[in-house]
Amino acid sequence: MDKYIVNGRIGEGAHGIVLRGIDKSSMKVVAMKRIALKNINEQGLPNSAVRELLALRLIRHDYVANLVDYFSQGYSLVLVCEYLPIDLNEFLRANVKPLAISHVKSYMWMLASAVEYIHSLHIMHRDLKPANLLIGFRGELKVTDFGLCRVFRNPELVGSTNAEKDQQLFTHQVASRWYRAPELLYGSRTYGPEVDLWAIGCIFGEMLKNSPLFPGENDIGQLCTVIQVLGTPDEEIWPGVSSLPDFHKISFTSTKKQVSFNEILTEVDESSRIMLERFLRYCPKSRITAQEVLEAAYFQQEPLMTPLNDLPLPIEKPLNTATAEFANWDWSATHF
């Protein structure tokens, strides 16, 4: 089914190439994620592709880049989603100064709304970062790229008699380093949706500061940057930390906070710094939840959120539209 015209490359990541296309029937612009399927006859669809497809089919939210269509093409799975012209990372880099607090509040509200809904479906995103947050032509922010998502069990439905047996095991090699929660850096395989809240806190701080909050060069360096601000974790502030797989493999001299958020965010109001601290806590269970974010008094305090219609509009980035790149692509599609 020759339904789409491909007219440019948006980007490329670990999970596939993202192209800009046009739906011939509606003439709407769409984003098309092409995921290569290796050895499909022997192994079937990769788990990551299945999870992303199932999640996108389930999720319908104003602040998620929703799935429009999907189909197989040769040895590829193509996910067709609504098109948004720029991501938050590009948007922030294009601004010399940090965003206005009222703008930051609006983006945080939209992000928390999306994540609260995603978590209500018992799905962890596990790769929240500015590059996976898109900004649309109306100024709205939407979550994208569910390539690392996983379903987590409802804690209320998990029995307590065989707690160890009931635990889900996940890989800790998820999330981009600068947004990776401490439990992941220490090798935890039994984490939960709190990893997304840590990532949101890092994104929040980056919007306030206009540069990454914890820019570590490697995993150990990442822990160092966090420890400089939060101090060395111990059992008192993070019960169970000493039992994490890599805790004793990485030794740090016990230290208190060396740099405070007041020093990092010198021109940020106190209420924003207090709100940020609620995300960036070592103990996962002490972190604010997405639902609590939406209920926080922070959003009712001055300055109030900028209305959607008054948010800055993105400038669409130039695309790679070299025709030779797409000349030999057969986009006749077989729908599942």
PLM regions: where:
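Activation-segment/catalytic-loop signature of the eukaryotic protein kinase fold
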Residues: 70
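C-terminal intrinsically disordered, low-complexity extensions immediately downstream
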Residues: 304-336
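Conserved short submotifs of the Hanks-type protein kinase catalytic core
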Residues: 75-87
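C-terminal lobe substrate-recognition/regulatory segment of protein kinase catalytic domains
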Residues: 232-277
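Activation segment signature within eukaryotic-like protein kinase domains
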Residues: 107-108
